């Protein structure tokens, strides 16, 4: 009974959800229809705000904005990647290490003074990192990759006065964003093929190191070959479609919903700064 129930429990364990990058979640919503430049401006503004005002109020209000945007965009819970166990262990070790630093506030437990300052600082940095990661994930989940490069070219148009090659940078960004998912898939296939290869355990430690070195060299050579092949195919496709200028020539301008989004973000940011500066520090 016990020997058969254990495999059953292991067999019904849910598989871990992988990290999906640069692939939008299917659907139609107000967040999906926003101009890509608006999303980039919101991410940039919130990042600057959290850099200069990394308080709990600011983090909480920005987290509320991200959660509201995810709810409006109908982002399913399955889109969230599974947190690996080793990351929880690293966070626990970091929390314990930071808690040893002490600091204010101090809590008395059974006559022992415990400083919670280090632990609170660690939790605040962790929460800030989660908010920034969620912002980037929202852009990835609701934005087509082809819309990012034209938005960067449009936003960087004022810098052309300084002779900054904005269009060339936008084209390079478009190529990188389009090549990244393909290369990730190719590397996963190469890694899976390497794991399926039959292995013989060398008798000595030196032989094992030599085998690992040979496998690493073979994997790097295959990765370079795949990268060059994909680059050649992408170059042919770009040439057939009219050159690199078409990559940053996607029409797109802010609409009413974009201005409303920027206004809501500015109001929330201003409210958070006012609470942090005037009320909590008065």
Curated annotation (Swiss-Prot):
Primary subcellular site in the record, as a coarse category: membrane
GO CC, alphabetical: plasma membrane
Any Pfam family matching the protein: CbiQ
Keywords assigned by UniProt, alphabetized: Cell membrane, Membrane, Transmembrane, Transmembrane helix
Species: Mycobacterium bovis (strain ATCC BAA-935 / AF2122/97)
CDD domains per the UniProt record, alphabetical: EcfT
Similarity field: Belongs to the CbiQ family.
PANTHER family tied to this protein: PROTEIN ABCI12, CHLOROPLASTIC
InterPro entries: ABC/ECF_trnsptr_transmembrane
Protein name from the UniProt record: Uncharacterized protein Mb2352c
Subcellular location: Cell membrane
Bilayer topology term: Multi-pass membrane protein
Transmembrane regions: 18-38, 40-60, 87-107, 119-139, 164-184, 260-280
């Amino acid at each position: 009974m016990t020997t058969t129930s254990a495999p059953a429990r292991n067999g019904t364990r849910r598989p871990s959800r992988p990290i999906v990058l640069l692939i939008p979640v299917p659907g139609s919503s107000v967040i999906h229809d926003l101009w890509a430049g608006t999303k980039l401006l919101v991410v940039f503004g919130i990042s600057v705000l959290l850099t200069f005002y990394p308080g709990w109020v600011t983090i909480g209000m920005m987290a509320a904005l991200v959660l509201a945007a995810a709810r409006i965009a109908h982002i399913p819970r399955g889109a969230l990647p599974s947190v690996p166990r080793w990351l929880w262990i690293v966070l626990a070790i970091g929390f314990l290490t930071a808690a040893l630093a002490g600091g204010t506030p101090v809590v008395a437990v059974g006559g022992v003074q415990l400083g919670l300052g280090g632990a609170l600082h660690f939790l605040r940095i962790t929460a800030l990192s989660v908010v920034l990661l969620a912002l980037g994930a929202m852009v990835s989940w609701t934005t087509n990759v082809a819309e990012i490069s034209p938005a960067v070219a449009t936003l960087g148009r004022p810098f052309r006065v300084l002779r900054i090659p904005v269009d060339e940078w936008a084209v390079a960004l478009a190529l990188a964003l389009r090549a990244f998912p393909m290369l990730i898939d190719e590397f996963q296939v190469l890694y899976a093929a390497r794991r399926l290869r039959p292995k013989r355990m060398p008798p000595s430690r030196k032989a094992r190191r030599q085998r690992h070195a040979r496998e690493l060299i073979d994997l790097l050579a295959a990765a370079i070959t795949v990268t060059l092949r994909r680059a050649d195919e992408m170059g042919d496709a770009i040439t057939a479609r009219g050159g690199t200028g078409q990559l940053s020539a996607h029409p797109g301008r802010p609409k009413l919903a974009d201005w409303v989004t920027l206004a809501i973000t500015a109001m929330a940011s201003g409210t958070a700064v006012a609470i942090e500066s005037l009320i909590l520090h008065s």
